[in-house]
Amino acid sequence: MPSLNRVQLIGNLGRDPEARFTANGKKYATFTLAVNRSWKSVTGEKQEHTDWFMVNAWGKLGDFVVEYVKKGRLVLIEGRLQTDRWDDAKGETHYRTTVIARSIQLLDRKPEEPEEVEVAVEEVSE
């Protein structure tokens, strides 16, 4: 049976990307992405909510993000979801879902940058 794990998000970086390394020494970038949504309640009042996503970018894409993408930038991220499971010292099970970015496109523009920059790389696993 076919399967699909793909996500597209447009939002603003909640903090500057941070370079990290796995236990095996593989480098990646991690950051949060704020995606705003709004709707009208049954009474007609505007409601707003921000969903926060953890995003990891590996390899050259991660290097690009750390160097050029900063807090507040509007980006389009395409990638997949990855859920990690672990047990803590008390034996309690925890889960964390992260977006693994395959491409990141800058949607806002600074005067010294081109109108649109897109970087895509092959996916690298831990």
List the model feature ranges, each with a label.
Residues 7, 27, 49-51, 95, ...:
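Exposed loop/turn and edge beta-strand positions of beta-sandwich/beta-sheet ligand-binding modules
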Residues 42-67:
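A beta-strand/beta-hairpin structural motif
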Residues 1-4, 17-24, 40-46, 90-92, ...:
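Acidic, gly/ser/pro-rich intrinsically disordered tails
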Residues 19-34, 95:
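Short aromatic-glycine-enriched beta-strand elements
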Residues 58-94:
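Beta-rich strand-turn-strand
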